[in-house]
């Protein structure tokens, strides 16, 4: 993996020459991650293949989408998802912002749009059910993510974390976490940062298990997902 690109004076990243800081949870958390992700990948493999077919045949485009996110110790990795947007989504979004300046303010504040013009019909269903994130099980097995942890962010989002960024960087980003079970997109970005900080400061394997079990009703009820 490549290191995130920022100046050496940045407070957000731990310089490589100082040595890597071990992620929270150590071997216990990593063992749980590998076991849980492997079992989930096996159990959901029929659904995985069905979604692959639906995405491919919906518009003939690519099945997966990988976007660069910042992980543990500031390392950059490609966060995998099933593609839920049009192939030329950036052009569509630029035109949408030109016509709807208020939407740009929503985007700048949360990095999300409640009515995103780039999302396909199949993609909207996958997002509503959080099924677009199933490929992140592969990120977990590869050691880039964890089952539970802070929401993976892009590089410029860490500026919104301010001094709390150091807590984000101590953990691998998670497939689920406090933010996902507490309203997701219905909560402010500042609240999301507070959730991530609280999680890292108070980590325990038992807390991870509680979050995993609470994720099930949150996903089934589509709380805050769009």
UniProtKB/Swiss-Prot annotation:
Domain of life: Bacteria
S-S bridge residues: none
Pathways per UniProt: Glycan metabolism; exopolysaccharide biosynthesis
Keyword annotations: Cell membrane, Exopolysaccharide synthesis, Membrane, Plasmid, Transferase, Transmembrane, Transmembrane helix
Membrane-protein topology: Single-pass membrane protein
GO molecular function, one term: phosphotransferase activity, for other substituted phosphate groups
InterPro entries reported for this sequence: Bact_transf
Location of this chain's protein in the cell: Cell membrane
Keyword flag Ribonucleoprotein: no
Organism: Rhizobium meliloti (strain 1021)
Transmembrane segments annotated in the record for this chain: 34-54
GO biological process: polysaccharide biosynthetic process
Any one annotated GO CC term: plasma membrane
Name the record gives this protein: Exopolysaccharide production protein ExoY
UniProt cross-references to Pfam families, sorted A to Z: Bac_transf
Function: Needed for the addition of the first sugar (galactose) to the isoprenoid carrier. May function as a sugar transferase.
Family: Belongs to the bacterial sugar transferase family.
